[in-house]
């Protein structure tokens, strides 16, 4: 039977519960335990797929096509366990399912209520597919005291009673703020947060206290006294210089040992943290550095490109170099700001995924700069589409080339995908289809051209990558684009959908329709990012 670890947050949001869950799971995994992490999101959206990146940050896509919270990216990067649809649920999805059952008459005339119907659905989600696991970590989004999270808190209260106190514990993440004027850390917010959680029937077993200054032993004792936990269960969590040092830091503070003790496990094997020490060494002791420009639409909020940021860091780790990222708003190149001055110092240019016309001409201008100046270029999703439009206009003589996403065009080099094959069979979409959950989502296979650059990067001719798009490069333009030097080096297995383009006459110019950043991990950098950074290192010696 799996044991459950419920992770809540108090005082303020953005305390890093997701990172804490990922780190704890990694520590348990390092001791030989089988783990899985799940996220409960209290918002009423069915999933984050239609939410603005400025509201939510990145949408993380799983192999099975789920659009999920960005925390699942942390979970997967830290544990190597592929996330799936059953690992993320929202209030909206739960209510959608319950209302559908009510309309079908499944409840046989009963009054449908938050308790038991909503709470039972939450518990079913937590317990699903856990027979082969040792630990299931469940992170509850939001902050204790929020109205939206009350059904989730009630559900974990019930679940703790149902599985037994020896099989479920609660870890509460709080803030211990430092008041500079007083020169003190203040524990009162933590006390009040724990009191609020306890009033809902959940007594924390362990407190993880986020703080910017070391937590004195006297303050740990004070928190333990007023929050009804052992002093050893009050774990300080100082700000870290890198997220990749957090697992080792938490182990040093005794988090994993205290969790095991709470379960009565006193003979657990010692953790093997060799891989984490190696990652820390590569991150903290680089042997060089490169500067990568990311020309995007949502650059004012880096969380919108969270996996991309981390994948670039992983590429740097592979070659022991520090990757400096310059976030460049594509729109500034449409306002006649100096393109050369902004792009010339860069060792590589990356155009990431996105939606809509805004900033598209700036991205196309960046692609042209990279092509003409022989600067390593990496285009992802929309970035590949921009590379194809740039090629059509400037090397294939198709002056009016554009995307139907941006409006009517006589030369639709990029257009809406209307049909494709998925694991569920033939998928069909139209211009009036609902936006939510209707894109080409999840893992799809692709075949690479033998002897192509991208095949040498991967070391194979067959790959599987995750997608999230509803527009695709129009295969009818392939011949003209290839005559202009842009080669289609990766296609869907049926040969219908372009997946990868490259320029053989360029030092490193690759565009991909998928999102390789979603599969990159610190101990297993994605080959495309490792290759891109390697090319940037070579470029840095030329600048």
UniProtKB/Swiss-Prot annotation:
UTP binds at residues 13, 186-191, 222. GO terms for biological process: 'de novo' CTP biosynthetic process; pyrimidine nucleobase biosynthetic process. ATP binds at residues 14-19, 71. GO terms for cellular component: cytosol. Gene3D superfamilies: 3.40.50.880, P-loop containing nucleotide triphosphate hydrolases (3.40.50.300). Residues 1-265 are annotated as: Amidoligase domain. Its EC number is 6.3.4.2. Keywords: ATP-binding, Glutamine amidotransferase, Ligase, Magnesium, Metal-binding, Nucleotide-binding, Pyrimidine biosynthesis. Pathway: Pyrimidine metabolism; CTP biosynthesis via de novo pathway; CTP from UDP: step 2/2. Residues 291-542 form the Glutamine amidotransferase type-1 domain. The keyword Manganese does not apply. CTP binds at residues 13, 146-148, 186-191, 222. InterPro entries: Class_I_gatase-like, CTP_synthase, CTP_synthase_N, GATASE, GATase1_CTP_Synthase, P-loop_NTPase. It catalyses: UTP + L-glutamine + ATP + H2O = CTP + L-glutamate + ADP + phosphate + 2 H(+); L-glutamine + H2O = L-glutamate + NH4(+); UTP + NH4(+) + ATP = CTP + ADP + phosphate + 2 H(+). It is an enzyme of class 6 (ligase). GO terms for molecular function: ATP binding; CTP synthase activity; glutaminase activity; identical protein binding; metal ion binding. L-glutamine binds at residues 54, 354, 382-385, 405, 470. Coiled coil: none annotated. Mg(2+) binds at residues 71, 139. Pfam families: CTP_synth_N (PF06418), GATase (PF00117). Homotetramer. Belongs to the CTP synthase family. HAMAP family: PyrG. This is CTP synthase. It comes from Sphingopyxis alaskensis (strain DSM 13593 / LMG 18877 / RB2256) (Sphingomonas alaskensis). The lineage of its organism: Bacteria, Pseudomonadati, Pseudomonadota, Alphaproteobacteria, Sphingomonadales.
């Amino acid at each position: 039977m799996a044991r459950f670890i419920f992770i809540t947050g108090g005082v303020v949001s953005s305390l890093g519960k997701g990172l804490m869950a990922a780190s704890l799971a990694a520590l348990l995994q390092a001791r030989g335990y089988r783990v899985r992490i799940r996220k409960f999101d209290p918002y009423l959206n069915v999933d984050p797929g239609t939410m603005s990146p400025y509201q939510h940050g990145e949408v993380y896509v799983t192999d099975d096509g789920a659009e999920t919270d960005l925390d699942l990216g942390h979970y997967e990067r830290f544990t190597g366990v592929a996330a799936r649809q059953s690992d993320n649920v929202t209030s909206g999805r739960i209510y959608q399912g319950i209302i559908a059952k009510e309309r079908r008459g499944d409840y046989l005339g009963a009054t449908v209520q938050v308790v038991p119907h909503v709470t039972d659905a939450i518990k079913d989600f937590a317990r699903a597919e856990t027979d082969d696991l040792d630990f299931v970590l469940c992170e509850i989004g939001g902050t204790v005291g929020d109205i939206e999270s009350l059904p989730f808190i009630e559900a974990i209260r019930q679940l703790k009673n149902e599985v037994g106190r020896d099989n479920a514990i609660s870890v509460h993440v709080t803030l211990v703020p430092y008041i500079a004027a007083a020169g003190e850390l203040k524990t009162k917010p933590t006390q009040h947060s724990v009191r609020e959680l306890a009033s809902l029937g959940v007594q924390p077993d362990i407190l993880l206290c986020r703080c910017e200054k070391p937590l004195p032993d006297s303050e740990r004792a004070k928190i333990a006294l007023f929050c009804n936990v052992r002093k050893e269960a009050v774990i300080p969590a100082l700000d870290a210089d890198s997220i990749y040092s957090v697992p080792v830091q938490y182990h040093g503070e005794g988090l994993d040992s205290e969790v095991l003790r709470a379960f009565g496990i006193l003979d657990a094997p010692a953790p093997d943290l060799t891989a984490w020490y190696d990652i820390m060494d590569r991150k903290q002791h680089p042997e060089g550095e490169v500067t990568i420009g990311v020309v995007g639409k949502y650059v004012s909020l880096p969380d919108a490109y969270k996996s991309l940021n981390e994948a670039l860091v992983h590429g740097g780790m592979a070659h022991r170099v520090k990757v400096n990222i310059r976030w460049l708003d594509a729109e500034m190149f449409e306002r006649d700001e100096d393109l050369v001055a902004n792009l010339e110092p860069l060792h590589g240019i990356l155009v990431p995924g996105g939606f809509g016309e805004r900033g598209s001409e700036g991205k196309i201008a960046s692609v042209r700069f990279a092509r003409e100046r022989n600067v390593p270029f990496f285009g992802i999703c929309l970035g590949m589409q921009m590379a194809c439009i740039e090629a059509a206009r400037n090397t294939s003589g198709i002056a009016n080339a554009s995307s139907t996403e941006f409006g009517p065009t006589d030369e639709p080099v990029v257009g809406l995908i209307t049909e494709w094959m998925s694991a569920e069979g033939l998928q069909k979409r139209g211009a009036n289809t609902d936006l939510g959950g209707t894109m080409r989502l999840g893992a799809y296979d692709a075949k690479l051209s033998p002897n192509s650059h991208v095949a040498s990067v991967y070391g194979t001719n067959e790959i599987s990558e995750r997608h999230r798009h509803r527009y695709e490069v129009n295969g009818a333009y392939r011949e003209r684009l290839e005559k202009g030097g842009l080669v289609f080096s990766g296609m869907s297995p049926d040969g219908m959908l372009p997946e990868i383009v490259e320029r053989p006459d360029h030092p490193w110019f690759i565009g991909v329709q998928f999102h390789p950043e979603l599969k990159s991990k610190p101990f297993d950098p994605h080959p495309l990012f490792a290759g891109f950074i390697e090319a940037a290192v070579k470029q840095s010696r030329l600048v």
